Structures are given as structure tokens and as C-alpha cells.
């Protein structure tokens, strides 16, 4: 997979845009995993997780998809923004660019998955963050529930979820 997509998601390689990236990623992964002779049941689990990770079309259906969703939706950080030309940024780029620190912590004893963010509010307000990311955080909450855990979100030191 690294040879195919060293720094982009599989779906983004196929379609250089966000629309339908989960579905494209699932199709590409299925082809790659089949060529690697992965057993069908394992391949189906992975492809299903990839196909269900987008907030517009999916949701966690098992613990594998829950793990994928939590990993994907909590991956918010400045280095995700590829362009140096700020005039080309969309709202997703601005939100990612504004996050100066992001830590995902799992506490087994407390059965808690926590995302701690530091957001530069001169770049992106909390309202703008939640306008884009509220649905994603709700997906994380549901994914955490499949693990029997609670999802917590802290932004700039304030408990949000």
C-alpha cells in the first residue's frame, strides 16, 4: 500500500477528492488484498471497515470499523494540509491547519478513549471546528461504544464531549 499511496489515503489516490473516497478506497484495498492472497473473510472485514468510515455514508458496524473510524476521524493536524498556498484552503484545510496539537489517549481501566486538541482560534474558531467535525466526533463516540468505552473530547483544555 505504501508503494501505491505513500502519503495519501487509498481513496484519495484514485479520485484526488474527498467525495466517495471511502468507496474508492475499499475497492482499491480489495484488489490489493486479493492480489496478496488474503482470505476472503479477512479481506471482507477490512474492505467493509474502509467502506464504512466516511461520515456521509457509513458508520461503525463492528470493532474493526470502529477502530478505523476512531483512527481516521481523530487524525486532525496541521501536517495533513499539503498545500502551502493558503488561498487554496477549503474549510477542512483551515481546521486541520489550526490544530497545533492532537493526542489520542486510550485508558483501558477507565474504558475511555480521549482526544485532546489544541486549536489556534485565530485560525479557526471552535464553531468552525464543530461545524466540520461534530459528525466525525459522534462517529467516534459510537465507535467507542462498540468497544464498551466512552469517547471524550477536550479542546484547548475545556471538556467538550
Q: What does each model-identified segment do?
A:
Residues 21-36:
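An active-site-proximal "capping" alpha-helix that borders the catalytic cofactor pocket
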